[in-house]
Regions:
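C-terminal catalytic-base region of ester-bond hydrolases, centering on the histidine
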Residues: 184-288
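Cleavable N-terminal signal peptides of Sec/SRP-targeted secreted and luminal proteins
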Residues: 3-28
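Extracellular/periplasmic catalytic domains that process cell-envelope and extracellular macromolecules
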Residues: 25-26, 91-94, 102, 190-193, ...
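Solvent-exposed loop/turn segments at secondary-structure junctions
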Residues: 37-39, 66-68, 104, 113-117, ...
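Serine-hydrolase catalytic core
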Residues: 147-211
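Catalytic nucleophile-loop/oxyanion-hole region of alpha/beta-hydrolase
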Residues: 68-80
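Serine-dependent carboxylesterase/thioesterase catalytic core
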Residues: 29-31, 35, 77-167, 207
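Short, surface-exposed "cap/lid" segments of acyl-processing enzymes
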Residues: 24-66
């Protein structure tokens, strides 16, 4: 999963991440929305306005250059760096939004995020993504060239090519602590400090395959015949990133939203909005 990277959170494949932080200040904090692949601030304007109205907090939209191209062409780790730089430039966030201090993060909400990966090239329709998707279908997805040139390749996990995935994929296996020799205990420690993890899956999802990846479910290694629920995966059983610890502590919430990938329905707003509202005078919110 990419979730534990919330301390330096960035855009990922067509989904939004909402992070909430704690502070001793008694004023409301602004929130930040990072865009997914092919999205622009203009396309998400209504979404942000509704959240602003419901939460009473000001929202910021973060674009990484021409987001349509950057989200597809720039490796995810580089997007992380760009996103952090953008946030640091916003004076309004200096006292209430911390991308580095994971201890300040309270709730993590993933809206249709491919937490366990995707089994193949994304089914996207806008021109540049469609062309690159065709490229992914023609060339080795774990080659150095593709991994450095096509961002979605960084979280493609082909169940029948696990060895190649672990050796060649430049983001997801590191993010999910799947490589035994490269596991980082800090990722697990920080992710385990979350107060709540909210995972939203779209019921008619076709962009992310399998759609259960939004709930950390995935195919077993070597097969696409069945989909394992989150608690039967290696990531959960070995608690590679702290998901099991959060679940056993009652801190994981699974939600379904109607429609296709990131369908901005009333149901989606109803799921998200309560987490954007203050629960006490000492709890404030930042969203990424």
């Amino acid at each position: 999963m990419m979730a534990y990277l919330v301390q330096t959170i960035a855009t990922k494949f067509i989904f939004l991440i909402l992070i909430f932080s704690l502070t001793k200040a008694a004023i409301s904090l602004p929130f930040v929305v990072f865009l997914g692949i092919g999205e622009t601030c203009q396309s998400m304007e209504e979404f942000i306005q509704i959240l602003e109205k419901d939460s009473g907090n000001h929202g910021h939209c973060i674009m990484l250059g021409d987001n349509v191209e950057v989200s597809v062409l720039v490796p995810i780790m580089d997007q992380v760096t760009l996103a952090c730089q953008k946030v640091k430039e916003l004076d309004e966030l200096k006292n209430g939004y911390n991308l580095i201090g994971i201890s300040q993060v309270k709730n993590f909400i993933s809206v249709g995020g491919p937490q366990a990966g995707v089994a193949g090239a994304p089914n996207c329709s806008f021109p540049i993504c469609a062309r690159l998707t065709n490229l992914l279908n023609l060339l080795p997805v774990y080659s150095t060239f593709i991994q450095a040139s096509v961002a979605p390749s960084n979280y493609i996990k082909i169940p029948t090519e696990i060895d190649a995935y672990l050796k060649g994929c430049k983001f997801l296996p590191y993010a999910n602590n799947e490589i035994p020799s490269a596991r980082n205990p800090i990722y697990k420690k920080r992710f385990s400090r979350l107060h709540n993890l909210v995972l939203i899956m779209f019921e008619e999802e076709t962009i992310i395959t399998p759609r259960e990846s939004s709930w950390f479910g995935y195919y077993p290694d070597g097969s696409t015949n069945v989909i394992l629920p989150f608690n039967e995966t290696q990531l959960y059983k070995e608690d590679l990133i702290g998901l099991k610890a959060l679940h056993e502590a009652g801190k994981v919430t699974f939600k379904k939203a109607p429609g296709e990938h990131v369908n901005l329905s009333d149901t989606l707003y109803e799921i998200i909005s309560p987490f954007l509202k203050d629960e006490s005078s000492t709890q404030k919110i930042a969203v990424a």
